[in-house]
A protein has these predicted regions:
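Non-catalytic terminal regions of proteins
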Residues: 213-215, 224-431
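Amphipathic, soluble alpha/beta structural segments
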Residues: 125-166, 216-264
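Conserved, well-structured beta-alpha core segment at the onset of a catalytic domain
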Residues: 41, 174-175, 430-431
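Conserved DEDDh/DEDDy metal-dependent 3′-5′ exonuclease domain
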Residues: 7-95, 251-318
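Acidic catalytic cores of enzymes that act on phosphate-bearing nucleotides/polynucleotides
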Residues: 157-237
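Conserved RNase H-like, two-metal-ion catalytic cores of nucleic-acid enzymes
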Residues: 1-29, 33, 37, 196-197, ...
Length: 431
């Protein structure tokens, strides 16, 4: 089943989508094959607006759910991932007034793709469609390149995480911007270590704080309160997400705490970090690990589709997954399905149902068992981690009230409602 708002925002008709010939699995495979064909030839830059917050993870999640054994295609080999949202935010900070913005009711700049394109003279006619958003994004990136070629090139130079890591580890201190609630500010930091819990996340010490004063504290319990008390004394750089690293000369270019300290003090603090990096990193990692152990562990059982970070298929399972994806033979996929167990069996079951319906199973009993399990989940009145039909119908009621004076919008709502009612009737027949 689907999110009602996704159909509203993207102006989609669920009845029309029912007529599409491609299964979810087939479309995912075609997308994967196209992307890997590009990256096998040359270095390929993928770009999405708010991609780090949505598109890249969603695509990887989709690949995982369709049994691709390596779903991280945007950060592998020749693939490079970019996100135009932080690039625009950094442009506005380091090269202000080069691009135009719409302003919201709180007098804040709007960074949504459609708004940016409209403000800069190339409004997306078919907003939220694949073609419309792609063309709008291409024009936005071309505008940034035109307005400040040097800054644009610099924005593309941090896509190789190994190069980023080598760079920030080798220099004494550097600058890096972060954006919170629409406001960008620059930090000046010195490298510490990799985060002990999250791969490719690296900790840096914020040099507006005096590390020598802070780390003279012998008690880790007291130190933990100091480090994590506002403002936090260390920050995180995600080296795999194109972080913008600025030369340390920028530390004093703005009227802020770093400018008041001056390069002499910043250099002294960076030297202290570099000289004592191993000991400092060990203490911080110990504090972070202890904190993670203290936190209440969420005992909620993950459904198979959520296990992209938790499921570690064996080499044999990965071989079977690859064979399942590569073959176009229904009987071969059914045979492989029987060799899976646990979450992988569930995922392959969903693919067989989506792709072949009844023909994906050896008996009517097996087919009805699968359908009954799905129907039970989708008709659940509990709060689930996936969209349910009752949840969709409740959203329809809300949208009816919101769209009561919008004839076209209300027609869309009723069209989706008719489709939901049809789905509900179909699923009820399997209970």
């Amino acid at each position: 089943v689907y999110e009602v708002d996704a159909f509203m925002v993207n102006n989609l008709d669920p009845f029309e989508l029912d007529q599409c010939s491609n299964s979810n699995f087939d479309l995912t495979k075609q997308t994967y094959d196209t992307f890997t064909k590009w990256t096998n030839k040359n270095e390929t830059f993928f770009c999405a607006h708010n991609g780090y917050g949505f598109d890249y993870m969603l695509t990887s999640q989709h690949l995982f759910s369709n049994l691709h054994s390596w779903p991280w295609i945007f950060s592998t080999g020749n693939a490079r991932q970019l996100d135009s949202l932080p690039i625009v935010q950094n442009f506005d900070f380091y090269s202000p007034n080069k691009i135009k913005f719409e302003i919201n009711e709180k007098n804040n700049k709007i960074y949504r793709l459609g708004s940016l394109c409209k403000a800069n003279g190339f409004e997306i006619k078919n907003l939220h469609s694949s073609r419309g958003d792609t063309e709008g994004l291409a024009k936005l990136m071309a505008l940034l390149r035109e307005k400040d070629p040097s800054l644009f090139r610099q924005s593309l130079s941090f896509t190789n995480k190994q190069n980023v890591l080598e760079n920030i580890k080798a220099i004494d201190y550097f600058c890096h911007p972060e954006t919170f609630y629409g406001r960008t500010r620059q930090f000046t930091s010195s490298y510490l270590c990799e985060h002990p819990q999250f791969k490719n996340y690296h900790l840096v010490f914020d040099l507006k704080h005096d590390p020598e004063l802070i780390f003279q504290e012998k008690s880790n319990k007291v130190l933990e309160k100091t480090l994590n008390g506002a403002p936090k004394k260390y920050r995180t750089i995600k080296v795999g997400k194109n972080p913008f690293i600025q030369d340390k000369s920028f530390a004093t270019k703005f009227d802020d705490e770093y400018a008041k300290l001056g390069h002499e003090v910043l250099q002294e603090r960076a030297n202290f970090i570099m000289k004592n990096r191993k000991e400092i990193a060990e203490r911080i990692c110990l504090i972070i690990n202890d904190k993670f152990e203290e936190q209440t562990i969420d005992q909620t059982e993950l459904i198979p589709e959520q296990m992209i970070f938790n499921l570690n298929p064996s080499s044999n399972d990965k071989t079977l997954m690859n064979k399942f994806v590569m073959t176009n033979d229904k009987d071969e996929q059914k045979r492989i399905h029987k060799n899976f167990d646990g979450p992988l069996k569930h995922l392959s079951e969903m693919i067989l149902l989506d792709k072949y319906d009844k023909d994906g199973f050896d008996s009517k009993e097996e087919y009805r068992k699968v359908r009954k399990n799905i129907s039970r989940r989708l008709l659940s009145t509990n709060k689930e981690v996936f969209p349910t039909i009752p949840e969709g119908m409740a959203r329809i009621d809300t949208l009816r009230e919101e769209k009561k004076d919008d004839k076209i919008g209300l027609e869309k709502v009723e069209r989706i409602n008719s489709h939901l009612e049809k789905l509900a009737s179909e699923h009820e027949s399997y209970l």
